[in-house]
Amino acid sequence: MAQHPCQDQEQKVEMTSKQQRSTSIEETMRPQEKQVTITETLWDQVLTVFKDIQKELQEDARIRGMSNCSMTPMTSAPRTGSIRPPDSLMTPKLRRLQFSSGEQPSGGRIHNLKTQLFSQSAYYPGP
């Protein structure tokens, strides 16, 4: 017995909707799995950045005399009357430059040094 043309079309629509539902279920599962999964490459990058930050902090502590090896605090130098910006405004590289040269640059000179350092940085677009 032949089926009515409407029944054929209904069966095709039903089959198509079942396929679409199974496909959509698979598609919704994949993004969730991708979000949950962290790749080894990403972890390697995170660990590398963490180690770099840790080295930077250790270097800064060593320069300031606060490393774990030396428990004796550094004596503070007598004030010479020069103006020194707060440490929060200085980058670690700028602090290294200041301590390695042994002098305390004036405010204008600090701004110039910051501008030079930031212009060389890949992370800072510039002043």
From Swiss-Prot:
Compositionally biased region (Polar residues): 16-26, 67-79, 113-127
Classification via InterPro entries: DUF4681
Region ranges (Disordered): 1-34, 64-127
Name of the protein in its database record: Uncharacterized protein C12orf54
